[in-house]
Curated annotation (Swiss-Prot):
Keywords: Cell inner membrane, Cell membrane, Ion transport, Membrane, Potassium, Potassium transport, Symport, Transmembrane, Transmembrane helix, Transport. It is a multi-pass membrane protein. GO terms for cellular component: plasma membrane. It catalyses: K(+)(in) + H(+)(in) = K(+)(out) + H(+)(out). Disulfide bonds: none annotated. GO terms for molecular function: potassium ion transmembrane transporter activity; symporter activity. This is Probable potassium transport system protein Kup. It comes from the Bacteria.
């Protein structure tokens, strides 16, 4: 039992460095934006206690109950994330709901990208702005310093973060302990802030401010940004360590700091704008700025890694075109680098920093994508509860009304800042959604066209009856589906008038599970004297590799010797069939993405000297 406890404790320790980076750095700006933003709330006991009560109950209802107790129950072999939730919702739902669940998953992925653009800029700027508190004449240098940190952060992605990653957890542990210490010290001088644990103060605040509460709630949302990481990173650490880290250290530390900032506002007659840095004695200020900068870099790294992981999932689900994915660690499958995603995210983050220039300006843009993802996760959770968990309707309706109602309120509150900057993550999210939707739709259309072509069984029977010249060795033809005759096979027969001694029709099938067990990797069926059909199963967290595929086939009795196997692929050239402006635009965009997508031979690591590619024209 002792080793198991040590393992759980160590995983909980590591989870602090990855899972809670984003939500853990929220005290830098969340409370400040309520009382010192462009539309500040008056500093008085009713307002301070009301905001603290709202933050506390947001932690309880959104983070603790909704995500840690309910959403995390929906997993695929321990893996989580919004695309996983979407895939689970599609499994047993009626056909119309499957389509809706798929579109919601794609939309949430787009919003996650929009949030990922804001998070590094917001976090790093809010930390570096501490310099202006310690040395006001250094204020003009805040933006350049923050941008240099961002440039360095994105530059090291190609080298991987395995070496420095081991320091993430100790740094974040120190960060949370400092948060707790600073907050507890302030609470000692104004213990009356603890009365905000009573929900009556939140209710009184809402009644006091009426319709203006919506605007203020949009700022309270900043305290729970990053909550989706709890679910997305579940596969790396397990839900138990993530829960232990939250309830044992992260939540108490964050609440102590927020309540400490509230105590600071109540004890000083003229408090300054930076409520977080004002908690520290002057002698601690520079070390605290340095620690905050490290913590925000770690939070940004967690978001960047999350984008890489989400991009790989989307590619394997068929929502994005294939891209180059590099593994940066020999020991961890999760350590990956996606150059295209890294460059797009870097350019977007730099643009956002130049456009908004300060964390105060960025606060208006932050939050709306988060609440949109929360809303989508609640909608998908209702589908999962009804059709996957088989809950009865009264129970489903109860959680639906509770969480969808709460998320609607939060989404409406962040929408009040739409014109001040909230449009940016929404615009980015919608652009990503359109890209993913067009790719998925047109790719599905290609599969349907392929399925309407020649029957595989009839084609094989016809070929076996013909007397073709036989070449030595094995030919592997990649096909889109089991019912699809590879164009490369047809062209090989038409122009070379030859068949190999052994011919393998190979299909890659991506499963709604993170990883496929090696014994289930390959399904092999000999359909005639010289033809085999092979289905290779790939999880959405895996990368296909032809060397591994050949090894798995050998374990099942189909030996593919590297020096005796030839791979024949068709390289498609797509043409637009004129059917209307919107249709033509979608197909044109799909064709452009196809041209720039990673080639199948590169994605599968097929040796160039064993590869033959044949050009094929197809009209869409």
């Amino acid at each position: 039992m002792k080793p198991a406890k040590q393992t759980t404790a160590s995983l909980a320790f590591l989870a602090m460095g990855i899972v809670y980076g984003d939500i853990g750095t929220s005290p830098l700006y969340a409370f400040k934006e309520v009382f010192f933003s462009h539309h500040p709330l008056a500093i008085n006991p009713d307002n301070v206690l009301g905001i603290l009560s709202l933050v506390f109950w947001a932690f309880v209802l959104i983070v603790s109950i909704k995500y840690l107790l309910l959403v995390t129950r929906a997993d695929q072999n321990g893996e989580g994330g919004i695309l996983t939730l979407s895939a689970i919702a599609q499994q047993n739902a009626p056909k119309p709901w499957r389509r809706i669940a798929m579109l919601l998953g794609i939309l949430a992925t787009g919003f996650f990208f929009g949030e990922a653009v804001i998070t590094p800029a917001m976090s790093v700027l809010s930390a570096v702005e501490g310099i202006a508190v310690a040395q006001p004449d250094l204020a003009p240098y805040v933006l350049p310093i923050a941008m240099m940190i961002i440039v360095a952060l994105f530059a090291v992605q190609a080298m991987g973060t395995e070496r420095i990653g081991r320091f993430f957890a100790p740094v974040m542990l120190l960060w949370f302990l400092v948060l707790a210490l600073l907050g507890a010290h302030a609470i000692w001088h104004a213990p009356q802030v603890l009365r905000a644990l009573n929900p009556a103060y939140a209710v009184h605040f809402v009644l006091l401010h009426g319709q203006h509460t919506l605007f203020i709630l949009g700022l309270v949302v900043l305290s729970v940004t990053g909550v989706e990481a709890l679910y997305a990173d579940m596969g790396h650490f397990g839900i138990k360590p993530i829960r232990i880290a939250w309830f044992a250290l992260v939540m108490p530390s964050l609440l102590l700091n927020y309540f400490g900032q509230g105590a600071y506002l109540l004890t000083l007659s003229a408090p300054t704008g930076s409520t977080f840095f004002s908690l520290a004695p002057k002698a601690w200020l520079w070390p605290l700025i340095l620690l905050a900068t490290f913590a925000t870099v770690i939070a940004s790294q967690a978001v960047i890694s999350g984008i890489f992981s989400l991009a790989r999932q989307a590619i394997n689900y068929g929502y994005l075109p294939p891209m180059k994915i590099a593994h940066t660690s020999e020991h961890s499958q999760g350590q990956i680098y996606v150059p295209a995603a890294n460059m797009l995210l870097f350019v977007a983050v730099i643009f956002v920093m130049l456009r908004f220039r300060s964390s105060a300006n960025l606060a208006a843009a932050y939050g709306i994508a988060v609440t949109a993802i929360m809303m989508i996760s609640s909608l998908l959770l209702v589908l999962v509860a009804r059709y996957q968990w088989q809950w009865r309707w009264p129970r489903v309706v109860t959680i639906g009304i509770a969480f969808i109602g709460m998320d609607t309120l939060l989404l409406a509150s962040t929408s009040t800042k739409l014109m001040e900057g909230g449009w940016l993550p929404l615009l980015l999210g919608c652009v990503v959604f359109i890209v993913m939707y067009i790719w998925q739709q047109q790719r599905q259309r290609l599969l349907e066209i392929a399925g309407n072509e020649l029957s595989v069984s009839a084609m094989i029977q016809s070929l076996e009856e013909e007397s073709f010249q036989r070449a030595a060795g094995t030919a592997v033809y990649l096909s889109r589906s089991l019912n699809h005759v590879p164009r490369s096979l047809l062209h090989n027969i038409k122009y070379n008038k030859t068949l190999h001694e052994r011919n393998v029709l190979m299909t890659f099938q991506y499963e709604a599970v993170p990883r496929v067990h090696p014994c289930r990797r390959a399904e092999i069926e000999q359909v005639s004297a010289s033809f085999w059909q092979v289905v290779i199963h790939i999880g959405y967290q895996e990368e296909p590799d032809m060397a591994q595929v050949m090894h798995c086939c050998g374990l099942k009795g189909l030996y593919l010797h590297p020096n005796e196997t030839l791979f024949l692929l068709s390289s498609e050239r797509l043409k637009v069939q004129k059917l209307g402006m919107w249709h033509d635009l979608k197909v044109w965009f799909f064709i452009q993405m196809s041209k720039h997508a990673l080639r199948t031979s590169e994605r599968l690591n097929i040796p160039p000297d064993r590869l033959i590619e044949m050009g094929v024209y197809r009209e869409m």
